[in-house]
Every structure is written in C-alpha cells, then in structure tokens.
C-alpha cells in the first residue's frame, strides 16, 4: 500500500518555465534502473548541473538556491510533464522529495502517472498561478498548505480551490495504487482461481 495523502504543508520552489518535458525532468540516460528509487539525484539533471556527471551544481538554477532546499511543493507553468510517457518522471520528482506539483495544466499521461505514484498534481488557473509565482518570489521560503480532502491550497492570506475526480482523490487519500486496488479484491480473486480447472491453475 502506498503512503496516504490527506494534507501536506511544504516549502514551495518556483520553476518559472512552461512545457517542461519528461526528458528535462529525468534525462533518458538515467532510465536504466527498474526500481523507483535513486532517480531524485538526477532530477532536472541538465538544468541542475553544469557537468555531465552531475557533480557541479548550476548556481543559476532555482532548485540549487539555498532558500529552496528541502522544497516539497513545485510551482510550474502550463503543460508540465509533456513529451514521452516515461513514468520515471514522477518517480524522480517523488524521490527528490516533491509531494505536490501546482500548474495550470499537465500532460495527460504525466497527470495519470502522478496519481499512481502519490504525487498530487494540482491544476489552478493561469491567473491563480501567476498570483502564486508573485507571492513565492516576494516571500522566498514561504510554505503552502495543500488539503486534498477539502481540495484547497492555502497560500499566504488566500485560499485556492482545485478539483480532483472522486476516484483518484479516494485512491490518494487511502494510499491505493493499482496493486493496492487489486489487493482489495484478493478474496474474490482467490475464490475465482480456486474454481478453475487444474490445468488452468
């Protein structure tokens, strides 16, 4: 069973870029692993580092700024997660420590993959995201409160409403991924299998 997501309060980092694709999130040369761990070290590798080995941090990239170390909420622009359908993108984001991504829109496959990996993608309007960027840039180190149950983001003095479809919301709040959903029907599956002829078992 995955970790339950009900509420999260976290430090916000502003990635002021639109159309951030999955190759930027986790470059293809790091996709050889078959487990979900270890990808955070290579998140935004070509932007975070000046060298190919990932040993020389780029001082101009926002994730390297001291005030954003330990950030768990990523604020981004439209069409986040576009490009190829690699599930490694949400793996890298969660392994780095992100719990929430806020943007005006997401690529469809990335959006679905995020829920499967307990990464909450929050859609707000362009105007609301503009407000949040201004707020974060004026208050480096600010924390947002994200409440999935109430479907609200509290930022500064304002509250922003978002909508998640009921099924995905239920799964995240109960820590259910695809395997967890299947295991809810373990008894029924076992009963069905027991009725099968021996040659089919």
From Swiss-Prot:
Pathway the protein takes part in: Amino-acid biosynthesis; L-leucine biosynthesis; L-leucine from 3-methyl-2-oxobutanoate: step 2/4
Keyword field contains Amino-acid biosynthesis: yes
Catalytically driven reaction(s): (2R,3S)-3-isopropylmalate = (2S)-2-isopropylmalate
MF terms in GO: 3-isopropylmalate dehydratase activity
SUPFAM superfamilies, alphabetized: LeuD/IlvD-like
UniProtKB keywords: Amino-acid biosynthesis, Branched-chain amino acid biosynthesis, Leucine biosynthesis, Lyase
E.C. code: 4.2.1.33
Domain of life where this protein originates: Bacteria
EC class name: lyase
Coiled-coil residue spans: none
InterPro entries reported in the protein's UniProt record: 3-IsopropMal_deHydase_ssu, Aconitase/3IPM_dehydase_swvl, AconitaseA/IPMdHydase_ssu_swvl, IPMI_Swivel, LeuD
GO biological process, one term: L-leucine biosynthetic process
Function: Catalyzes the isomerization between 2-isopropylmalate and 3-isopropylmalate, via the formation of 2-isopropylmaleate.
Subunit structure: Heterodimer of LeuC and LeuD.
Family: Belongs to the LeuD family. LeuD type 1 subfamily.
Protein name, as recorded: 3-isopropylmalate dehydratase small subunit
């Amino acid at each position: 069973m995955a970790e339950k997501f009900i509420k999260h309060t976290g430090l916000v980092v502003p990635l002021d870029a639109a159309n951030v694709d999955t190759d930027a999130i986790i470059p293809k040369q790091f996709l050889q692993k078959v487990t979900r761990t270890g990808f955070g070290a290579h998140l935004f590798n070509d932007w975070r580092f000046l060298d190919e080995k990932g040993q020389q941090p780029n001082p101009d990239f926002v994730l390297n700024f001291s005030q954003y170390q330990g950030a768990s909420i990523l604020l981004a622009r439209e069409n986040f997660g576009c490009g190829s359908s690699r599930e490694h993108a949400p793996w890298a984001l969660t392994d780095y420590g992100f719990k929430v991504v806020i943007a005006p829109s997401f690529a469809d496959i990335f959006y679905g993959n995020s829920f499967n990996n307990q990464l909450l993608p929050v859609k707000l309007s362009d105007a609301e995201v503009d407000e949040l960027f201004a707020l974060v840039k004026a208050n480096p180190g600010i924390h947002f409160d994200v409440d999935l149950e109430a479907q609200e983001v509290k930022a500064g003095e304002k509250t922003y409403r978002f909508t998640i479809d009921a099924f995905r919301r239920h799964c995240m709040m109960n820590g259910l991924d695809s395997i967890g959903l299947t295991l809810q029907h373990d008894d029924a599956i076992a009963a069905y299998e027991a009725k099968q002829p021996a040659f089919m078992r």
